[in-house]
Amino acid sequence: GSVALRLDKNILSKLKMPKTVISVTGSSGKGSTCNLIVDIARKQGKSVVFNDKGSNLVTGILTTLLAACNLKGELKQDILVTEIDERYTKLLFKYLKPNYVVITNITRDQPPRHGNFEIVYEEIKKALTKDMHLVLNADDPYTQKFILNSQNKYTLFGIGTNKYTYNDEKFENLNIKYCPKCNSKLLYNYYHCETLGNYYCPNCDFKRRKPLIEVTKLDYEKSFVVVNDEYKFNIPFNTLFEVYNTLAAFTIASLINLNLDEACNTISKMPVNLKIFNKYTYNDRIVYVLNNKAENATTYNQSLLFVKRNTELKTLIIGWKEISRRYNFDDLSWLYDIEFELLSNNEIDKIICIGPQAYDIATRLKYANIEEEKIVVIPLIDEAVKFIKSKTKGNIYGILNFDMVEPFNNNMKGEKSGN
């Protein structure tokens, strides 16, 4: 892709895309959503091009397109699915011309890179044209801004009330608290997480709209979802955002006229992505490994809800190797957007802080009123795991950035691993 752009900076405009083009963007969940869409379509005999081996920036996507096109620059496949970095939609949408645009969410993410999330919203908004069909989360009041005063067709997905919803606000640092139309404070019939839920404005007509695709039954313990009281499928792991990613893919399947019963079968048979979620045992203790995204408080908050949902005695390990691979910043402002206060009254034996910012994590936990005797700082992963194995109690929860997942698993399973 890089070489092709040097040879011809207009090369993207010379490629002919398939009839159906689906682009997925947002702060998190892009890759998971794309993988589901691609698997559902391929299992039903569709030929699909997907940038799973390239990056989600211009050169990575161009590499994928060039590998899939013929000598005339035509992509003859049935469907093109692209995962696109939210800041690159403005550069790519004008060439890809997606029929469907899935916007998973827009949250506080990578502050040194993005600044305020409003900047991300504005850049995606400018990239949209009126012929693009938007697929959005009905439970997210922020993404509804894309369809206010808009000519775009849109389809919504969401989750109805269930045994996991709650009525009182649990999170302080939120993306949106006020109505985007009249600036009144939004009220909620129920919450799922952060600002996700059944919201309404008391002073104007802004409210959660009825989604076309809605979860009518959700059971994390039995790992299944029922959609529209008709379609049932298993979810590969029991987190809220996995449900949302799956709903987004299921919505696309319905819009491009795939068989939804077959889609349910495909989703139910999807293997767990062990890089995102893992579960195994160590000496009769269950080990949960949750992959979180550094610089994104929302991913940590949904992990904390997962921890809080399980009421048994537990040990936590939290940390990362690098805050960012792309930028040489050690910005930790996002650490104070994570609602660690959810853990203050939970059944916790110890919380082990690891990595180069282990002491910063410990300081944040103290501000969250976690008892000081429960907080342990052990920067090196191998030493931390030895401590967990010998001096802690209860099930084990790894709330880790992706760069600590493999070292943690290797050490827990007794394999050699670097720090």
Predicted region positions:
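ATP-dependent carboxylate-amine ligase
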Residues: 1, 183, 196, 201-205, ...
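Phosphate-binding loop of NTP-binding sites
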Residues: 1-161, 166-178
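Short, surface-exposed acidic/glycine-rich loop or hinge patches that mediate macromolecular interfaces
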Residues: 27, 55-56, 240, 257, ...
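A generic structural signal for short, well-ordered alpha-helical segments in conserved domains
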Residues: 34-39, 250, 362, 409
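Buried hydrophobic packing segments
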Residues: 37, 41, 61-65, 246-256, ...
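Residue-level signal for inorganic ion chemistry
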Residues: 83, 104, 135, 245, ...
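Adenine nucleotide phosphate-binding catalytic loops in nucleotide-utilizing enzymes
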Residues: 155-298
